[in-house]
């Protein structure tokens, strides 16, 4: 035991000797290394002085900031050497030395690195992040020395290499270092401000190449301070660092930055030479302003981005808006279109939810909408509406008015028309909002009147029939006629009359003022013209009050709004009422649309009327009670209405309209929507503008209608072939056009073969080829085999590619129906020049023909050429139309068509006889809307929302809901019967009858709400007795035999 203790004691002593010798060797080696480094430092300082003198001599080639920076660095390094030489053997702590470089005792190695262009704090901070931290520091404490595993000689050798590299980079290659490494130093400087507390002075690397590589890899690691400092400066003309100008609030380790600028340091004063103070001040003054300005600009960029963040509902772009807000931006017509179109995208569950929401919202309007709903679903909903809005045109001899002639006849005509209107009232018409007690539409005796001077409105209420007398009607009608006299026209061109006639309409077009009573119209007319009496025989030469066109506009808007309401509340199964409303819209509103627009002077008011008509058309298009034929007509009418609205907008914003508004309304300012300044030519002719503006507004009353014969900018983009059932010889073609139109045609086998032969005769030699060019495959066609060139739409270079398949698809002589359908579909792959050729145009452009275009062709002489289709694309060969008369027989009607010479005419097409469809309800030779037989939907009952209040008593015996089948037909005794005798055998069948009655009342009470709880019938239950039961085969006494023997369920 003693031997073991003595052995351990001797081994411990040996270990202490070994450690002491190791520490002594390291201390000596460190002293030698420090002495060597001091000598190298003195040499590098001498080289720097020589370089500074050289830079001062040739200042034109070097930057002045570099000289001052070098001098400042030299003086600072000399002061640091004197300070650190006294404390070279002290112990260093990383955490304390990172905050203040002058107060902490650092090693000579860290002092040497201050001579480089990179500060020691920045370079050591960048080196701690890199992966090549293999070398340990030689200036560590005694604790770190014991842990280090590197030999002292190797560490000293590496340190010497680092120091020599630093000195060489400072002395030998100073120019290249300053020019190449300064942009990279700026990137290093931007990272060092936030992480000064993490710097390790004992682990560093002085090599510039490795430092730059490290900084390049860790460049994007921490940019938390970039928004504060303004980001990287990519200006290589100025190498000033912006770190110290934009301090981040942390203390700096070095008192001098790499750019020659004093950093904000809290170090105690160091004894330096007096020459260093002006150098420091000069280095501050040398700092130029552009980097600071750039830093300010870059610093302001994030603030601008924060200020420009899009606010909610700030822009009117629908993509940036809420869907509800975007919906509210549209006009009334588009809102109706969106509502009806979006319903088709809903699922059945969503539709039920929407129906419940609508039912809950409409419930409060039941009493208000009940009379309109009753009128809309009656047998004749349009009985009380006027048969025409504007009167038919007068005979030609009444164009000019002569006093004392035809007054009596004109008065009688007007009186008769007004009496017809006054006696007709819509049944259940609710009072319209806006002051109009009744809808009256003035007949116009003068068809060729001006737009600014219109005939007055005869919309007189029923209560004021006595006001609707001769002076009111004839005074205004005389004005409408007398306005066509040229002498009166000259009087209208005066300033007061034009300002009263035109500017009043413009100012009052958008704002609807409360209208006075019809009696006040007569008073205002006589008050405005006191010199002219209001008798029958004396005409008035002054224009009428401009309020009367507004009365006409108001009455038209009320009529269109009422028709839209009628169509909206019409039941979805009431096809008869919907057909009559549709007929009224087609025969009255749409037929007199141009005359209505003529009587409205302002373009904006015309657009408002057209949008109201568009709402009606949209409701007709989507309403389920409208027939498919009418829906197709209304769908085709929508494009024309939108084109007319666009034309009116263009007319409103034309230069002539702007000049007219600027001269008539506000002479000193431009009109609404005026974008261009007034030219000198317009200013020189300013005195003639009011005359031309008023005259132009009269004679240009008709808006430009889109001509049906538009030049041919359309072509076929797709063919879809289908085989007609039970007929292998006929095929139907669905043709899609580039303008969005879709037509249908029917061709037989022989007609398709003839089309194939014509295509082969025209384009049989053209081939489809493949050309490979740099890995890109493109297809093109050649015109013939000898000269293979590309088409003009692609290129004109020659090619020697091999022959490919021909462009025209192949069709075998004995092709099957499936191959014919495939051939029709392959025609869609023909190039555009073939689609626009005469073969395709003459074959399929006739499918775009419409009846109104054919009637227009009869009035217009055709030039007889093949390409006359381009002038009138929907023209086609002569057609025979067939129509059924009242007896059901076919009455063919041949329309006169210009027969062209056969050589220049279109190819005759096979006409399919189209008969008017028979009634789908009774099979009679009439339209379904004229059928008098009750339909199946009418028998089932309507599906409209009930307008009765909740909890109202319903008579179960007379309710139409009893026609429905019960939900639970075989529900066994769900409700108890008060009469116990009903459960006996003789009354068992009566009991089940009573069960069905109760179930119908519970589950089918018209959809009315019923509170939870026991059912209490409102009507006394009628019990059926034995005489109404079914006789049983085993029953001999006339009583139900269930009580006796036999099968108990024989009656069921």
UniProtKB/Swiss-Prot annotation:
UniProt feature, compositional bias: Gly residues: 1038-1052
Gene Ontology molecular function: RNA polymerase II complex binding
Chain spans, region Disordered: 41-320, 478-543, 667-689, 933-965, 1033-1052
Extent of Acidic residues compositional bias: 674-689
Region (gld-3 binding): 892-1052
Regions of compositional bias (Polar residues) in chain numbering: 163-172, 480-514
Biological process terms in GO annotation: germ-line sex determination; meiotic cell cycle; mRNA 3'-end processing; positive regulation of gene expression; regulation of translation
Region (gld-4 binding): 424-732
Signal peptide bounds: 1-25
Tissue-specificity statement: Expressed in the germline (at protein level). In the early embryo is expressed in all cells, then becomes gradually restricted to the germ cell lineage and enriches in P granules (at protein level). In adult hermaphrodites, is expressed in the mitotic region, accumulates during early stages of meiotic prophase I and is slightly less abundant in maturing oocytes (at protein level).
Keyword line: Cytoplasm, Developmental protein, Meiosis, Signal
Comp. bias regions, Low complexity: 67-145, 244-279, 950-963
Compartment(s): Cytoplasm; Cytoplasmic granule
Any one of the GO CC terms: P granule
Phenotype seen when the gene is deleted: Loss of maternal and zygotic expression causes germline survival defects. Zygotic mutants show a masculinized hermaphrodite germline. At 25 degress Celsius, hermaphrodite zygotic mutants show small oogenic cells that are either arrested in pachytene or have undergone abnormal meiotic prophase progression and failed to arrest in diakinesis, often resulting in endoreduplicating oocyte nuclei.
Compositionally biased intervals (Basic and acidic residues): 178-190, 305-320
Name of one Pfam family that matches: Vts1
Assembly and interaction partners: Isoform C interacts (via C-terminus) with gld-3 isoform A (via C-terminus) in an RNA-independent manner. Isoform C interacts with gld-4.
Miscellaneous remark of the record: Trans-spliced exclusively to SL2, suggesting a transcriptional coregulation with the upstream gene dhfr-1.
Role this protein plays: Required maternally for germline survival by forming a maternal complex with gld-3. During hermaphrodite development forms a complex with gld-3 which promotes the sperm/oocyte switch freeing the translational repressor fbf to turn off sperm promoting factors. Required for proper oocyte differentiation and oogenic meiotic arrest. Stimulates the enzymatic activity of gld-4 and together they prevent gld-1 mRNA degradation.
Protein name per UniProt: Germline survival defective-1
Provenance organism: Caenorhabditis elegans
Gene giving rise to this polypeptide: gls-1
């Amino acid at each position: 035991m003693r031997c073991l203790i003595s052995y351990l004691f001797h081994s411990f002593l040996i270990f202490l000797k070994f450690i002491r010798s190791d520490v002594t060797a390291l201390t000596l080696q460190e002293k030698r290394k420090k002495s060597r480094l001091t000598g190298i430092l003195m040499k590098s300082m001498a080289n720097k002085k020589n370089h500074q003198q050289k830079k001062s001599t040739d200042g034109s080639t070097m930057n002045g900031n570099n000289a001052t920076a070098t001098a400042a660095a030299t003086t600072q390094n000399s002061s640091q050497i004197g300070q650190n030489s006294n404390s070279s053997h002290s112990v260093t702590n990383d955490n304390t030395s990172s905050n203040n470089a002058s107060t902490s005792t650092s090693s000579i190695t860290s002092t040497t690195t201050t001579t480089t262009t990179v500060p020691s704090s920045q370079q050591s901070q960048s080196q701690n992040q890199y992966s090549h931290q293999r070398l340990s520091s030689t200036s560590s404490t005694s604790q770190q020395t014991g842990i280090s595993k590197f030999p002292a000689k190797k560490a000293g050798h590496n340190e010497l290499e680092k120091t020599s590299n630093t000195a060489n980079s400072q002395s030998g290659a100073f120019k290249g270092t300053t020019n190449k490494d300064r942009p990279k130093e700026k990137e290093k400087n931007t990272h060092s401000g936030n992480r000064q507390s993490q710097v390790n002075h004992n682990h560093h690397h002085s090599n510039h190449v490795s430092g730059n590589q490290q900084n390049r890899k860790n460049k994007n690691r921490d940019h938390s301070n970039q928004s504060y400092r303004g980001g990287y400066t990519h200006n290589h003309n100025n190498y000033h660092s912006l770190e110290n100008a934009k301090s981040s609030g942390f203390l700096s380790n070095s008192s001098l930055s790499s750019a020659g600028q004093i950093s904000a340091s809290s170090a105690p004063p160091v004894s330096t030479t007096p020459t260093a103070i002006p150098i420091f001040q000069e280095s501050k003054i040398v700092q130029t302003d552009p980097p600071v300005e750039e830093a300010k600009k870059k610093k302001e960029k994030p603030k601008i981005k924060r200020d420009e963040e899009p606010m909610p509902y700030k822009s009117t772009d629908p993509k940036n808006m809420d869907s509800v807000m975007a919906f509210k931006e549209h006009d009334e017509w588009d809102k109706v279109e969106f509502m009806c179109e979006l319903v088709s995208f809903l699922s059945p569950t969503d539709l039920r939810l929407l129906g419940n929401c609508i039912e809950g919202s409409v419930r409060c309007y039941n009493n208000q909408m009940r009379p309109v709903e009753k009128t809309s679903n009656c047998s004749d909903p349009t009985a009380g509406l006027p048969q025409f809005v504007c009167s038919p045109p007068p005979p030609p001899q009444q164009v000019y008015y002569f006093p004392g002639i035809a007054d009596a006849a004109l008065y009688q005509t007007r009186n008769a028309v007004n009496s017809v209107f006054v006696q007709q009232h819509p049944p259940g018409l609710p009072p319209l909002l806006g002051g109009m007690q009744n809808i009256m539409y003035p007949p116009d005796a003068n068809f060729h009147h001006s737009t600014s001077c219109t005939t007055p409105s005869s919309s007189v209420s029923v209560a004021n029939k006595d006001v609707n007398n001769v002076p009111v009607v004839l005074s205004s009608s005389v004005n409408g006629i007398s306005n066509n006299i040229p002498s009166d026209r000259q009087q209208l061109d005066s300033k007061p009359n034009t300002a009263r006639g035109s500017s009043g309409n413009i100012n009052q077009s958008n704002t609807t003022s409360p209208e006075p009573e019809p009696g006040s119209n007569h008073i205002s007319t006589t008050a405005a013209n006191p010199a002219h009496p209001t008798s029958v025989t004396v005409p008035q030469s002054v224009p009428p009050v401009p309020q009367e066109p507004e009365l006409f506009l108001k009455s038209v808007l009320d009529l269109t709004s009422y028709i839209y309401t009628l169509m909206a509340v019409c039941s979805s199964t009431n096809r008869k009422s919907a057909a009559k409303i549709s007929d009224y819209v087609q025969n009255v509103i749409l037929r007199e649309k141009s005359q209505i627009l003529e009587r409205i002077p302002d373009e904006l008011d015309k657009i408002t009327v057209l949008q109201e008509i568009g709402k009606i058309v949209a409701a007709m298009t989507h309403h389920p009670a409208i027939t498919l034929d009418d829906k197709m007509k209304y769908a085709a009418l929508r494009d024309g209405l939108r084109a007319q609205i666009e034309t009116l907008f263009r007319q409103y914003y034309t230069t002539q309209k702007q000049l007219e508004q600027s001269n008539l309304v506000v002479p000193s300012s431009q009109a609404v929507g005026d974008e261009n300044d007034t030219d000198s030519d317009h200013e020189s002719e300013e005195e003639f503008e009011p005359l031309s503006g008023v005259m132009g507004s009269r004679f240009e009353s008709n808006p430009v209608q889109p001509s049906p014969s538009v030049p041919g900018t359309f072509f076929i983009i797709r063919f879809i072939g289908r085989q007609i059932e039970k007929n292998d010889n006929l095929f139907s073609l669905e043709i899609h056009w580039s303008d969005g139109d879709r037509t249908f045609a029917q061709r037989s086998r022989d007609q398709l073969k003839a089309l194939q032969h014509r295509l082969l005769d025209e384009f049989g030699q053209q081939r489809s080829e493949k050309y490979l060019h740099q890995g890109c495959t493109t297809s093109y066609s050649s015109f013939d085999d000898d000269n293979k060139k590309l088409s003009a739409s692609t290129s004109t270079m020659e090619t020697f590619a091999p022959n490919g398949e021909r462009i025209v698809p192949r069709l075998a002589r004995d092709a099957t129906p499936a191959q014919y359908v495939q051939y029709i579909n392959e025609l869609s792959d023909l190039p555009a020049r073939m689609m626009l050729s005469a073969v395709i145009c003459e074959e399929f452009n006739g499918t775009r023909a419409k009846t109104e275009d054919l009637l227009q062709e009869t009035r217009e002489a055709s030039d007889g050429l093949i390409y006359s289709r381009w002038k009138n694309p929907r023209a086609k060969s002569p057609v025979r139309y067939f129509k059924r008369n009242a007896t059901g027989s076919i009455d063919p009607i041949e329309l006169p068509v210009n027969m062209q010479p056969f050589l220049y005419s279109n190819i005759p097409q096979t006409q399919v006889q189209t008969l008017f469809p028979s009634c789908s309800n009774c099979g009679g030779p009439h339209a379904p809307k004229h059928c008098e037989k009750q339909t199946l939907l009418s028998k089932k009952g309507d599906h409209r929302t009930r307008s009765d209040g909740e909890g109202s008593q319903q008579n179960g015996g007379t309710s139409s809901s009893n026609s429905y089948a019960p939900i639970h037909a075989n529900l066994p005794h769900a409700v108890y019967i008060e009469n116990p005798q009903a459960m006996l055998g003789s009354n068992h069948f009566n009991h089940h009858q009573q069960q069905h009655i109760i179930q119908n009342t519970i589950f089918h009470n018209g959809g009315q709400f019923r509170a939870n709880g026991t059912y209490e019938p409102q009507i006394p239950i009628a019990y059926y007795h034995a005489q109404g039961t079914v006789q049983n085969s085993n029953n001999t006494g006339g009583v139900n035999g269930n009580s006796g023997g036999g099968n108990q369920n024989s009656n069921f």
